[in-house]
Design a protein with these regions (language model features):
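Conserved adenosine/adenylate-binding substructure
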Residues: 162-170
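Cys/His-rich short segments
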Residues: 2-46
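Short glycine/proline-enriched turns and hinge-like loops at secondary-structure junctions
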Residues: 23-24, 41-42, 69, 112-113, ...
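Single conserved hydrophobic/aromatic residue that forms the stacking wall/gate
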Residues: 175-184
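N-terminal strand-loop-strand
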Residues: 28-70, 74, 96-99, 120-122
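Unchanged
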Residues: 75-162
């Protein structure tokens, strides 16, 4: 927010009026032409592909050793949440999604993102990784996830911390069953 306020000083519509900061810095207003300006928010889908009661976690090259997380990607212009989930799962791990179940959102203010958490039921468990995106992926059962939470994962796998959407999706999966649906 500090950076956004620092770079948005003048009105983009009438170009010669200074903007006034309101609502604790979350909005700017031009007193001359009444234009309101809000910070940009980039929507991101983050999802757990699910097949036969197991979820798929992926590992990017930039992750710390042995860390795995949910898959994620930005929504493209004109795309629905469901379309983005289908596209990202197909692009990153080569799986076909047959249903998407929205779970929750979380603002991620430090990079101006809105994280949209979903479960995605897939047709099978045969991955084809885009190695530019995902270095390795692993299917985990609820029992495997429980072992990770108590520090007894045989591969010493770990997941993002509790504040992260990926962590919350994994916890949600432990305590609920994704609803099977035909199609999207």
């Amino acid at each position: 927010m500090v950076e956004w306020n620092a770079v948005n000083i003048f009105c983009s519509r009438c170009e010669n009026s200074k903007l006034r900061t309101v609502d604790a810095g979350s909005k700017k207003v031009c007193d001359k032409c009444k234009t309101e300006l809000f910070p940009r928010v980039d929507p991101v889908v983050i999802m757990l592909p699910i097949f036969n009661e197991k979820c798929l976690l992926g590992r990017q090259k930039i992750f710390p050793p042995r860390m795995y997380s949910a898959l994620a990607g930005f929504l493209e212009p004109g795309e629905t949440i469901e379309d983005a989930v289908v596209r990202e799962v197909k692009e990153e791990v080569g799986l076909n999604v047959n249903s998407v179940e929205y779970k929750f959102t979380q603002p991620w203010p430090f990079s101006s993102q809105l994280m949209i958490g979903c479960f995605s039921n897939v047709d099978d468990d045969k991955t084809n990784l885009d190695e530019d995106e995902i270095e390795h992926a692993v299917w985990l059962s609820r029992e495997d996830i429980n072992r990770i939470f108590v520090g007894k994962s045989p591969d010493r796998i770990w997941i993002p911390p509790a504040m992260a959407v990926a962590h919350q999706l994994i916890v949600c999966l432990l305590y609920t069953s994704p609803s099977p649906r035909d199609g999207l």
